[in-house]
Every structure is written in structure tokens, then in C-alpha cells.
């Protein structure tokens, strides 16, 4: 019995490395505009996870077939717009954000997606103004 449990665990561990783990994941966006009174927290989904990549350190000898660079990116995305509270009449209170409906492993489309990772400051401060939450619901 113990051997079958250990074998099953080992197979699951090995198989999980071969299966891409690229899925929509809950994420909170923080939007703060200078002219508005509040910082807004918007709950949405983004694509996040592991995708198989390979990069040879001998590109000249190996050629492009040994260069596979894929990331977790949008397959289907929906854009939603919210009205930011506390904005004066002269300011545009609309903010549009993406909601990942499905994801896949592939190359990032720089024409439509943000492909660069932006490092956070790490201090935990996300807003300098009072915080308001906006929750999205799937239609």
C-alpha cells in the first residue's frame, strides 16, 4: 500500500512538470489618479503560471530549434470599465482594465499585451489616498 502511494506521488510530481500550469488567477489592481480623491482596488483575473521554455547557451551551434521562449499569456480577454469615485468634473473618471477569461502558453503579443514584468517596490504601500474597493462580476 505504501509503495503504491509513493509511486502515485512520484508520478504526479513528474507529470506536473510536463503539464503547463498557466491559468487565470485572482489579482488586485490599484489605480490612483492625482486629480481624484481615492485610490481604487479592483479585483480581476490575470494569466499566471508556468510554461515550458528552453534556451541553449550555444545558440550559434544549436540553431533556433533549441530556443523556445513561451510565457503565460491571454487566450481570451475581456476589457471592463469602471467609474473611479471622487474625481472632479474636469477629470476623466473612466478606467479600463483586462479580465483574463482563459490563458495559454505562447509568445506575448506586444501589440495588445503588456509583456514586461514590472517589479513592485516591496514596501507594501499601494496607495497614498483612502482606498475604495471595486469588485467585478462575470457576466
From Swiss-Prot:
> Which InterPro entries does the protein's record reference?
Cystine-knot_cytokine, Glyco_hormone_CN, Gonadotropin_bsu, Gonadotropin_bsu_CS
Q: Which residues form the signal peptide?
A: 1-20
Q: Which cysteines are joined by disulfide bonds?
A: 22-72, 36-87, 39-127, 47-103, 51-105, 108-115
Output the Pfam families linked to this UniProt entry.
Cys_knot
Q: Which GO terms describe its cellular component?
A: cytoplasm; extracellular space
Instruction: Name its species.
Output: Salmo salar
What's the family? Belongs to the glycoprotein hormones subunit beta family.
Q: Which UniProt keywords apply?
A: Disulfide bond, Glycoprotein, Hormone, Secreted, Signal
UniProt xrefs under Gene3D superfamilies: Cystine-knot cytokines
Q: What is a single molecular function from GO for this protein?
A: hormone activity
Q: How does it assemble?
A: Heterodimer of a common alpha chain and a unique beta chain which confers biological specificity to thyrotropin, lutropin, follitropin and gonadotropin.
Superkingdom as given in the UniProt entry: Eukaryota
Q: What is its main location?
A: secreted
What is its biological role? Answer: Indispensable for the control of thyroid structure and metabolism. May play some role in the biological processes of the immature fishes.
Q: What PANTHER family would the database entry show?
A: GLYCOPROTEIN HORMONE BETA CHAIN, THYROTROPIN SUBUNIT BETA
Q: Per its record, how is this protein called by name? A: Thyrotropin subunit beta
- Provide the glycosylation site positions: 43
Please tell me whether the keyword Lyase is annotated for this protein: no
GO BP, sorted A to Z: G protein-coupled receptor signaling pathway
Gene name, per UniProt, is tshb
Tell me where it resides. Secreted
Amino acid at each position: 500500500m505504501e509503495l503504491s502511494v509513493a509511486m502515485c506521488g512520484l508520478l504526479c510530481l513528474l507529470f506536473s512538470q510536463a503539464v503547463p500550469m498557466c491559468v487565470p488567477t485572482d489579482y488586485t489592481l490599484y489605480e490612483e489618479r492625482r486629480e481624484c480623491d481615492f485610490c481604487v482596488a479592483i479585483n480581476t483575473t490575470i494569466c499566471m503560471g508556468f510554461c515550458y521554455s528552453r534556451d541553449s547557451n550555444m545558440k550559434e551551434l544549436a540553431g533556433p530549434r533549441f530556443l523556445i521562449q513561451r510565457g503565460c499569456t491571454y487566450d481570451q480577454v475581456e476589457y471592463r470599465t469602471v467609474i473611479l469615485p471622487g474625481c472632479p468634473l474636469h477629470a476623466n473618471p473612466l478606467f479600463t482594465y483586462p479580465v483574463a477569461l482563459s490563458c495559454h502558453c505562447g509568445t506575448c503579443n506586444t501589440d495588445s499585451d503588456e509583456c514586461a514584468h514590472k517589479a513592485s517596490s516591496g514596501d507594501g504601500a499601494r496607495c497614498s489616498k483612502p482606498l475604495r474597493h471595486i469588485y467585478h462580476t462575470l457576466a
